[in-house]
Amino acid sequence: MDAVLSVQGVSAPVKKKSFFSKFTRLNMLRLARAVIPAAVLMMFFPQLAMAAGSSGQDLMASGNTTVKATFGKDSSVVKWVVLAEVLVGAVMYMMTKNVKFLAGFAIISVFIAVGMAVVGL
């Protein structure tokens, strides 16, 4: 007895698109349409293109002391955030019995401490 396996439909190899197929004339025109206005603006307004120059002044410098007093290491905001993390972690652990929620506050506290150090608070 001869057994024949058959597959429904016609099987044809799927052609993969090459990397260079993305560089069509239409895509290049779209890119030019997006880049040319920005280049023209930079040509006519070079001070906007070089806005990160060294001649600028920091307009937010006057608020540094307020931010450090509100969100600094010894501020009450950070203490309340850590307390809220502990309470939410404990409640979530009681509800789900998942240890990840219980240890989550320690991980978030580390992220807050590292973030404060990176920002400079």
Curated annotation (Swiss-Prot):
Pfam families: TraA
Residue ranges that the UniProt entry lists as topological domain Cytoplasmic: 97-100
Periplasmic side: 1-75
GO cellular component, as recorded: extracellular region; plasma membrane
Entry-annotated residues carrying N-acetylalanine: 52
Subcellular localization(s) per the UniProt record: Cell inner membrane; Secreted
Quaternary structure and partners: Monomer. Interacts with itself to form filaments; also interacts with TraQ.
Protein name: Pilin
Organism of provenance: Escherichia coli
